[in-house]
Amino acid sequence: MNANPILLQKKYARITEKFAALENLPLDKALGIFYHSTLYRLMRDGVSDMHCMSDEYLTEDLCREYHSTEQAQ
């Protein structure tokens, strides 16, 4: 299922803002991390209706992905 592009962009913005606040990152860096994440690709491609999940859940998922990627480097 494909979400409305405008609503999806707003969801991306909310997730990025929450992620930046939780990780104490500048918004531009948080946005770059988000757009290079697996989470973004899944949401963009409409996999498993990820866009239907709550902002909090998706932000936590992004934090987990960020920390696992950070540790792998």
What are these regions (language model features)?
Residues 1-73:
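C-terminal alpha-helical interaction appendages
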